[in-house]
């Protein structure tokens, strides 16, 4: 492999001649060759957005020559578009500040900008990775800003639209099923009736509240650390640089980012992301309940609850012919477990803000973006390939309703709790109908029984 010589503050490093990265990236490839997971492309794009925004501000302030600024912007745009995606090989498991990744982006943009200006890669002339691309910046404010940009863009553009899709479908099902009366279950035992629509309205409300929590916690993500540089003081920036670069970032992303009023907390801690992850955790908890209920209610087809008919997307067994499984429910529940686990990792990582810098940034970024990505994808699939096609099994629902002993609850106000309990126990012991045992006691007539024990009337206050 042909090499070229690059240098940094430590010395000379041989870099593959066809690559845009430089010495810092090559060192990281050697010293942090841990695992297979590379830094999320969204972080790379977000850092490039910061670089182009800084170059624009510096050009306006006449702190960088126009041709250099223009070349940086053009190179940054290529990074953002994914054109240079093979130039970012670094693993998540690196320095806790993300310095190697920031320098990876600096070097790639620098060398590509040099190329645009007809220079020679690796010379750092006329575009220097630190003096020009990283001007007025530190990894310590760039990486947390990139984290917030990534979280905001991925949530707004992917996660929330997919959650909204599921919300709409659950609401639609709650209306579609509003006249279907079924037996309720508490403690996995028979309980009083409700409508299938009421049951689905509970799922709808859970998801609606989850979306609201995510939207509320997203507000703090819109505050950016950029302009704080090394420890939050803004050293090596001109006054109001934070406001100007944030304005450029907002303009490009079409998201109303704002400069964090206190840069120290945004660099030393990641409470906003820990809190945001908590809202994803709550959403995962809700989705776990919803998807489990749906797959349990769809169990069978003959030896389970069988109250829901789930879409048949693919064969379910390599040995049992004709078997179909609730695979979408299984996939989304596995994602929920991962999101809950990611939140634990983020919470622990959030505690490691030692003095002026949290040093678990790459882990936090990896976990939160993975959670957003997995939730977004799984919810979309769950919506389109499961919830949308759910149908009620009316015969099975009626069978369970008619056989339930808990309909006796409606008699309690008329004949008393103790008498109602005795009737239910006798019906169970004798394998007889509730109505038969109730009339046999002489406490109530058949006419009264039929009037009181009316499942549809039991789905609301009397």
Predicted regions and their residues:
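Conserved, well-structured ligand/cofactor-binding cores
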Residues: 1-462
